[in-house]
Amino acid sequence: MKVLVIGNGGREHALAWKAAQSPLVETVFVAPGNAGTALEPALQNVAIGVTDIPALLDFAQNEKIDLTIVGPEAPLVKGVVDTFRAAGLKIFGPTAGAAQLEGSKAFTKDFLARHKIPTAEYQNFTEVEPALAYLREKGAPIVIKADGLAAGKGVIVAMTLEEAEAAVHDMLAGNAFGDAGHRIVIEEFLDGEEASFIVMVDGEHVLPMATSQDHKRVGDKDTGPNTGGMGAYSPAPVVTDDVHQRTMERIIWPTVKGMAAEGNTYTGFLYAGLMIDKQGNPKVIEFNCRFGDPETQPIMLRMKSDLVELCLAACESKLDEKTSEWDERASLGVVMAAGGYPGDYRTGDVIHGLPLEEVAGGKVFHAGTKLADDEQVVTNGGRVLCVTALGHTVAEAQKRAYALMTDIHWDDCFCRKDIGWRAIEREQN
């Protein structure tokens, strides 16, 4: 069968790489893909943008694609799933209505409140003055979020009132996030440890994926501004068996049932960003209507199941007949980024030292890369590579991932040096 993966990031390289391992699959197309997917023998890039839904549909129909897997959020919010389904094509992802869980933070907070799903106390605002009055009433630390899609960067954790007020002005008056910031959510600052809890949903059944933990801040020890994610590891020891059960009972099931009851039946990957307090009680920080990036990369390295088989089962509402199998080892991925990210950065730098053949127990997933006219791999984004490795402990996986990137370099590249530090502290204690 033929599979189409929509997207061009590290997440899509990992999903396409995994899909190509399925015995059911003869070809995996990636639209538009990157240099990493271009260089994989089993993958084929297609020059179609992720939100060019008419062109994606034409391609899928002409090539007789048997299954489409959607990586990023933008085409989901624009209704790619609705369009493909209307044409009778199998596609794994939520409809535009269901994708509001990521597309609008205000929608999500109101949904969580209606269904009594644990989350931070909050209020929505479209005007500067009422927002500032609320800030003064609540004090800092406090969290300000742009309502719409902002590539994972539309969240400001303000430790002082001045910082919070500046964020409100930037978003509501200063157009810092364009349309995404015309409405904001202000919510209480939650203390605890974060985890990424990702499941597959087929409308009524749920299959949990391996747990993981992302590193949102750009600097070591979680300093500096938020990014799309600087590295991740799996599994996340903070998600104990008890926390896992509470998350399923208090968050995942009520969300899936609540969406169905409101006429937005959810199919696709559902990612709950959790904050887990010292007592092991999870609260929802955010929902994403797709797999996380960079969490996908370490999770796919651990996945032993057939991803395509699982997606097909989900498209037929048969996830209850499936289980997922995982490598017992831990995996860890470190993002190599372009200097200046998450602010302004340069593109077009030649990347040197990429491994020429597959590495046992490791993988360099490409994100912001492309093939230049002379076939050299050059940078083409802020997050450029995710260097990922397996290990018997998170500490060993970390050591192997950093060793794998020793020879890889380009002008002005950087990475965090402490990915996995929370899990490693736990292992050492």
Swiss-Prot record:
Pfam family for this entry, one: GARS_N
Cofactor: Mg(2+); Mn(2+)
Region annotation (Disordered) ranges: 212-236
Signal peptide: none
EC number(s) from the headed UniProt entry: 6.3.4.13
Cofactor note: Binds 1 Mg(2+) or Mn(2+) ion per subunit.
Gene3D superfamilies linked: 3.40.50.20, ATP-grasp fold, A domain, ATP-grasp fold, B domain, Phosphoribosylglycinamide synthetase, C-terminal domain
GO molecular function, one term: metal ion binding
Binding, ATP: 135-196
Recorded catalytic activity of this chain's protein: 5-phospho-beta-D-ribosylamine + glycine + ATP = N(1)-(5-phospho-beta-D-ribosyl)glycinamide + ADP + phosphate + H(+)
Composition bias type Basic and acidic residues, residue spans: 213-223
Domain (ATP-grasp): residue spans on this chain: 109-316
Alphabetic keyword roster: ATP-binding, Ligase, Magnesium, Manganese, Metal-binding, Nucleotide-binding, Purine biosynthesis
Subunit structure: Monomer.
Role this protein plays: Catalyzes the reversible conversion of phosphoribosylamine to glycinamide ribonucleotide, an enzymatic step in purine biosynthesis pathway.
Family: Belongs to the GARS family.
This protein's name: Phosphoribosylamine--glycine ligase
Species whose genome carries this gene: Escherichia coli (strain K12)
